[in-house]
């Protein structure tokens, strides 16, 4: 059986049971977001949400830090900062974020796939299987990675450049033959500019020493857990940079370049 057929079967089973969207009766299960990806694209790199505050909304997710100081990964209630050296550091609760997405991870769908699969194949398999592309999916993948390519972003100085310029000189790292976890989301197309439409995924190795924003990979022995919700809540900063930013422009091309 192909992996997309296994995903389809897994989603269908939980649809029939009636627990796909509300695991264990959690009617208020939601994805929480601080600020927008559009603001980040415009160089709004300072927010007013602390990681201590963010942790009250979720134990699983991704984002960044004020001054765009690296990539963030939240896994099992622990927050990690991937700095420009590619290494993972613990995040103090006083640190602040200009953009982050979290949820209280409570998956209903699990798929185990032993065979090799790459990033494009994985996206295609999930896209074919999801019962709707108009809701929100939090995705955790624990696997052996034969190869993975990630990036991070270096701390910026004011005046902040747009994110697309930062991404053109981002540090990239390639690793092989290691175990780790993918932490990510699939957002609907209609959310482009609020978030990244489609997939946005970060990586943390099993030893919790390195990671980054995922650009490509080949993995095997994958255990895929998916949390589905129809609820999304966002808070935007009350600081001047966000309030004064021009967020009316169409940023599809810039988002695609910066995130891929």
UniProtKB/Swiss-Prot annotation:
Disulphide bridges, residue numbers = none
Recorded catalytic reaction(s): these are: (2S)-2-acetolactate + H(+) = (R)-acetoin + CO2
What is the main EC category here? lyase
Report the EC number(s), separated by commas if there are several: 4.1.1.5
GO process annotations (BP): acetoin biosynthetic process
Q: Which InterPro entries match?
A: Acetolactate_a_deCO2ase
Keywords of this entry: Acetoin biosynthesis, Decarboxylase, Lyase
Pfam families on file: AAL_decarboxy
Which GO terms label this protein's molecular function in UniProt?
acetolactate decarboxylase activity
Part of which pathway?
Polyol metabolism; (R,R)-butane-2,3-diol biosynthesis; (R,R)-butane-2,3-diol from pyruvate: step 2/3
Main role?
Converts acetolactate into acetoin.
Its family remark reads: Belongs to the alpha-acetolactate decarboxylase family.
For this protein, the record's NCBIfam families field holds: acetolac_decarb
Stated name of the protein: Alpha-acetolactate decarboxylase
> What organism is this sequence from?
Methylococcus capsulatus (strain ATCC 33009 / NCIMB 11132 / Bath)
State the organism's lineage. Answer: Bacteria, Pseudomonadati, Pseudomonadota, Gammaproteobacteria, Methylococcales
Question: Gene name, please?
Answer: budA
């Amino acid at each position: 059986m192909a992996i997309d057929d296994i995903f389809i079967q897994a989603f269908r089973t939980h649809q029939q049971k009636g627990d796909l969207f509300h695991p264990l009766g959690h009617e208020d299960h939601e994805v929480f977001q601080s600020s927008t990806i559009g603001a980040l694209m415009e160089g709004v790199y300072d927010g007013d949400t602390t990681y201590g505050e963010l942790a009250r909304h979720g134990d699983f997710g991704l984002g960044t830090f004020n001054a765009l100081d690296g990539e963030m990964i939240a896994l099992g209630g622990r927050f990690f900062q991937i700095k420009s050296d590619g290494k993972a550091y613990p995040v103090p609760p006083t640190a602040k974020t200009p953009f982050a997405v979290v949820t209280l991870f409570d998956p209903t769908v699990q798929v185990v796939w032993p065979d090799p699969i790459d990033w494009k194949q994985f996206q295609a398999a999930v896209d074919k299987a999801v019962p709707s592309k108009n809701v929100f999916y939090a995705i955790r993948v624990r696997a052996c990675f034969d190869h993975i390519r990630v990036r991070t972003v270096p701390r910026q100085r004011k005046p902040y450049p747009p994110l697309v310029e930062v991404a053109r000189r981002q540090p990239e790292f390639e690793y092989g033959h290691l175990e780790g976890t993918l932490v990510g989301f699939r957002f609907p197309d209609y959310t482009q500019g609020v978030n990244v439409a489609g997939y946005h995924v970060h990586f943390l190795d099993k030893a919790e020493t390195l990671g980054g924003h995922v650009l490509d990979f080949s993995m095997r022995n994958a255990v895929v857990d998916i949390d589905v919700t129809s609820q999304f809540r966002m808070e935007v900063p009350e600081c001047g940079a966000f309030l004064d930013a021009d967020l009316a422009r169409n940023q599809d091309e810039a988002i695609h370049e910066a995130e891929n």
